[in-house]
């Protein structure tokens, strides 16, 4: 089996394609079950965030994985990147460290990679190969973030959106802000907003208890998601990041809210993939809609500022990839050595037991020892002898050269006048 990673991200695919490729909620376990049912796949894990969908697998080939992704989201094959073996290892190390993120060094991605590993493990999709890779990934990401400043003063998509809101509304502390969702992105937005102060903070979520917890931490007011439309007109700024499969905020709802606000502008940040806010909302006058793709341009300055630290992290990753591949190769080479040792041990034990029985039956010791020596020689040398004969017939120079390296002819060696037959003496 070969290690593969196939995926698309904010650099290779637009948001409308990424949202079709995303796996949210219960779709993730079902997708893993479907993947594991493929005869070419032995292990699999899926990483799905607002900026990327990636499939990690131990598989015979990549074609079946591409076909599987195409079945899930038709039309994405032209946007996919594909890595195998060492380059797949490097890619995962870079992703978990934040080097492949829209916001360079952002810390949330490591938690998302851990979540992907945990879900795959919980649903029996991981074997020793991928499990070992993810465990090593967590160690490498931790070291890269500890030994460099790639994660210093982290800037997230949420904090970038809040900064844009502050730039757009000179008096954000006199504004009403509506947060939709209660996940990590919205938690970060709430944290940054409460640090900068807002006049009123509304938090709407499908599970009211989660909204209430977040509201109590940041001085906000919790709303059930069913009340969203009723309170939309109160919001000067909206941040939305849920796992909904369909938009929660429609063009019609925003039009109604703008009329109720007497055309007072609204600023909306859709931080979700799939999108929470209908794209056509951005066509409305007095409604200013930003998606995660729009925010990528806003974080480019941050990316340039962290490049030196990122270069240091890349060097750490290069070293760790080399070490990981060396470990895998050493492990792979141990398997035939273990089989050879097991063959020798079982042959010895079998023939020794036979010799002891012959001694017990009164057979002369010298005769038993000679037969034991002949039998051991013939039994142990029969497999390589047969393989070398086949190699000679098939002109397999690689195998014959390996035999020469394993059994070099010693200077002054004289071939015996006869050799024992290539069979076990009875």
Swiss-Prot record:
Residues annotated for NADP(+) binding in this entry: 181-186
The identity of this protein, by name, is Glutamyl-tRNA reductase
Record region (Disordered): 405-426
- Chloroplast found in the keyword field: no
The pathway this protein participates in, as annotated, is: Porphyrin-containing compound metabolism; protoporphyrin-IX biosynthesis; 5-aminolevulinate from L-glutamyl-tRNA(Glu): step 1/2
Organism of provenance:
Xanthomonas axonopodis pv. citri (strain 306)
Entry keywords, A to Z: NADP, Oxidoreductase, Porphyrin biosynthesis
Which family is annotated?
Belongs to the glutamyl-tRNA reductase family.
The UniProt function text for this chain reads: Catalyzes the NADPH-dependent reduction of glutamyl-tRNA(Glu) to glutamate 1-semialdehyde (GSA).
What HAMAP family does this protein's entry cite? Glu_tRNA_reductase
Where substrate binds, per the record, is at 49-52, 101, 106-108, 112
Could you give the domain comment from the record?
A: Possesses an unusual extended V-shaped dimeric structure with each monomer consisting of three distinct domains arranged along a curved 'spinal' alpha-helix. The N-terminal catalytic domain specifically recognizes the glutamate moiety of the substrate. The second domain is the NADPH-binding domain, and the third C-terminal domain is responsible for dimerization.
Q: Which NCBIfam families does this entry report, sorted A to Z?
A: hemA (TIGR01035)
Does the keyword section mention NADP?
A: yes
Catalyses:
(S)-4-amino-5-oxopentanoate + tRNA(Glu) + NADP(+) = L-glutamyl-tRNA(Glu) + NADPH + H(+)
Pfam families attached to this UniProt entry: GlutR_dimer, GlutR_N, Shikimate_DH
What processes does the entry annotate via GO biological process terms? protoporphyrinogen IX biosynthetic process from glutamate
Q: What class of enzyme is it?
A: oxidoreductase
